Amino acid sequence: MADSLAAADGADVTADDLAPGAGTAALGPVVLNAAQRAERTSRAGPVARRLAGTGVTIVALCWVDNTGVTRAKTIPLGRLERAAGWGVGMSPVFDVFLINDDITISKYIGGPGGDLRLLPDLERITPLAGQPGWAWAPVDRYTQEGQVYAGCQRSFTRRMTEQAAEHGLELRMSFEVEWAVGTEDGGSFRPACVGPAYSMTRVVELSDYSREVVEALERQGVTVEQFHPEYAAGQLEISVAAADPVAAADDNALARHTIRAVSARHGFQASFAPSVVAGTVGNGGHLHLSVWRDGQNLFAGGPGRYGLTGDGEAFAGGVLAELPALTAVGAPSAASYLRLVPSHWAGAFQCWGRENREAALRLVTGSAGEQDIRANLEVKCFDLSANPYLVAGSVIAAGLAGIRSGAKLPAEIDGDPAALTADELAGRGIRRLPQGLPEAADCLDRSQVLRRAMGDPLFEAFLAVRRAEAELFGGASADDIAAQTRWRW
């Protein structure tokens, strides 16, 4: 029995039961009126009593900022009813925090003025198995006047999900979670295990820790589909069940927090940084997604290549076309570009391929006889320095733009693009994705698709943070970038 008071029940886009319909996040009102505030306050009472029955005494109200860091304000459980109806105050300036907690400014956000309200999602409040006595609650951010805040990343994802529904589409998403577990030793990373990559030796070395990570996630309603040791030193990975886009982003934020909490209880630290040690394989945050209409997976059962339907191909084509700009969203840190290098299965080239782990966009078709439930897209160039809500919403926006324009996929690539000559790459229309944060920010700045989707306040704040971090790390070495950001995510 999950401890989550309203766990998102989903299916795994990389495994079984991909059909949509479960785990759909409730859509919030655009403007809160007095009756809605009273209704929220009333609903919070039973939730608080149920939380108290599990031993919870304090609630962390959490949001993910434009650097990918989860920020929080906490309240005693007795304040939940008030917070549910009227929120908890915060400054808009958090939207222009940098990864080192410096503050920049954007066209719309910055400075000491203004206030927002954090309203917990009562359907997702979850007792934390790895942090007894605490509960986690993702928040939606509203203005003092009760309007949805234009810079709220979670609301952006919800808005894009609604736009997809207007096209008759349901989306299922899941983020892979890779992390390195270890400790800091004289400024260097010391892995918690020494066994070979993917080996049972690592499982034995971290047996109790690994079991507790999986058990904690399951108790919190996050269904773990797979857990395994990964390639880099001290690196592990989990794959979780799919859900609708908002719930998938919630699950990603909760999974990372849970792993961090369990790690601390074992005397370890968990790093989700794209580059834990410069020059080695980094942590990815690949996104899997499937798109459905009337119960049909648009990536299977159609007349196109590998069973793609027309709208399935158009959605994928839209994502592929926007990948340079999407890279700034899904690989948004200076450390991202220490990971995003060719021939490392990171997806460093703007291309697609069936089951090609070097392509930035991988079509996963599944085995014969079950493609209709398993087929999905994997975006491989993303990592966990990203805000999962911005990633989910931006990918939907790109895919919908592809459907509107009738986008077509180019010829696929079935090997490592890095093995091709410059002339061969040019002849096939394959380009390297941005190789640094300044280039990625420029690509984002030129994207009318993402600007229109996010709206200027959110878009400009996010872009300002990217520009400021590009300047912050402009003269830093790879070793310095990795060391300075290792424990920030």
Regions found by a protein language model. Give the residues of each.
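Active-site-proximal beta-alpha loop/turn segments in soluble metabolic enzymes
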Residues: 181, 190-200, 233-247, 277-282, ...
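Short glycine/proline-enriched loop/turn "hinge" motifs that connect secondary-structure elements
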Residues: 126-133, 170-172, 227-232, 280, ...
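Catalytic-core signal marking the mid-to-C-terminal active-site face
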Residues: 2-3, 13-34, 42-49, 254, ...
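Short, contiguous, pocket-lining structural segments
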Residues: 201-209, 226-232, 244-255, 259, ...
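Accessory "access/gating" subregions that flank catalytic or transport cores
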Residues: 203-213, 218-224, 238-245, 256-272, ...
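Core alpha/beta catalytic barrel or barrel-like domain that forms the active/cofactor pocket
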Residues: 172-183, 220-240, 270-286, 290, ...
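ATP/Mg2+-dependent ligation/transfer catalytic cores
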Residues: 2-226, 248-251, 390, 428-489
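Secondary-structure transition/capping motifs at alpha-helix termini
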Residues: 53, 165-168, 245-249, 260-270, ...
